């Protein structure tokens, strides 16, 4: 059983929801990332979402876009991020780590090399924001060879047919984007998100996590009432800039 499946199973038996925290690899400088990951786990984070720095993060708002800029300026690249996971695994073999990023750096490295290296370093899954399921078959074949999960996005605009299509291909968990916009944007509509999540959960047993717009304890608690995981990005990343 994968680390993600094990963790979600443990939380379900404890009647708890997962706290998934995003951190940009190498932000604000490379030496901070691994100690920060351990501190996050000690503080109660259940799943780590490690951002891969990219120069054109089209789905990210200003907070995470600036984090990517700082990481790139500090010299962190995709392979460096994988090595950070490898170092993290020297002390933590249990906390799931999911990579979140964009397709271009992965294609540059090559699917086989990227996935095999990520697996060897202790990565559990990947979410590429700009890779839709219709174009993900080649990567999926390689991920399955290494028992790694491929996570996909669903949004408020996703049709019922789209939901059915995506849940058939996803593994690990479904990432529901609760807002129409970039990360860290706007105000969360809890009622709409709850309705959409219910539709997704009616189609699959895969856990559903909610991200985008989770900015405080109130919104996290509200989403934890309807989803299996609460994903916090910008609200955590913003103070990291001062480390």
Question: What kind of feature is each model-predicted range?
Answer:
Residues 1-11, 30, 55-66, 73-86, ...:
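Active-site-adjacent beta->alpha loops and helix N-cap segments on the catalytic face
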Residues 6-28, 61-67, 88-100:
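N-terminal small/glycine-rich loop or linker at the start of catalytic domains
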Residues 30-41, 158-168, 210, 214-230:
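Catalytic cores of alpha/beta
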Residues 45-55, 123-127, 132-135, 176-184, ...:
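Glycine-rich phosphate-binding active-site loops on the catalytic face of alpha/beta enzymes
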Residues 21, 40, 51, 118, ...:
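Conserved, mostly hydrophobic/aromatic
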Residues 44, 118-124, 142-150, 168-176, ...:
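Glycine-enriched alpha-helix->loop->beta-strand junction motifs that scaffold or abut catalytic
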Residues 191-231, 235-239:
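A C-terminal functional module that forms or caps the active site or interfaces directly
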Residues 19-23, 48-50, 97-101, 126-128, ...:
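Hydrophobic faces of well-ordered beta-strands that scaffold small-molecule active sites
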């Amino acid at each position: 059983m994968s680390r993600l499946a094990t963790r979600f199973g443990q939380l379900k038996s404890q009647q708890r929801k997962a706290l998934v925290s995003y951190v940009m690899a190498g932000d604000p400088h490379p030496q901070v990332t691994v100690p920060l990951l351990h501190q996050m786990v000690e503080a109660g984070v259940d799943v780590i979402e490690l951002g891969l720095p990219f120069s054109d993060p089209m789905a990210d708002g200003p907070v995470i876009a600036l984090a990517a800029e700082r990481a790139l300026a500090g010299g962190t690249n995709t392979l460096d991020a994988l090595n950070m996971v490898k170092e993290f695994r020297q002390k933590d073999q249990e906390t799931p780590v999911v990579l979140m990023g964009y397709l271009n750096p992965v294609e540059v490295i090559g699917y086989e090399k990227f996935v095999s290296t990520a697996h060897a370093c202790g990565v559990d899954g990947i979410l590429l924001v700009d890779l839709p399921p219709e174009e993900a078959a080649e990567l999926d074949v390689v991920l399955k060879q290494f028992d790694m999960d491929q996570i996909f996005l669903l949004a408020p605009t996703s049709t019922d047919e789209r939901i059915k299509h995506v849940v058939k291909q996803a593994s690990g968990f479904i990432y529901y984007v609760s807002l129409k916009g970039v990360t860290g944007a706007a105000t969360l509509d809890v009622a709409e998100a709850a309705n959409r999540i219910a539709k997704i959960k009616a189609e699959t047993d895969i856990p559903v996590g909610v991200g985008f717009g989770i900015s405080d304890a109130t919104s996290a608690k509200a989403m934890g009432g309807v989803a299996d995981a609460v994903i916090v990005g910008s609200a955590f990343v913003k103070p990291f800039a001062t480390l």
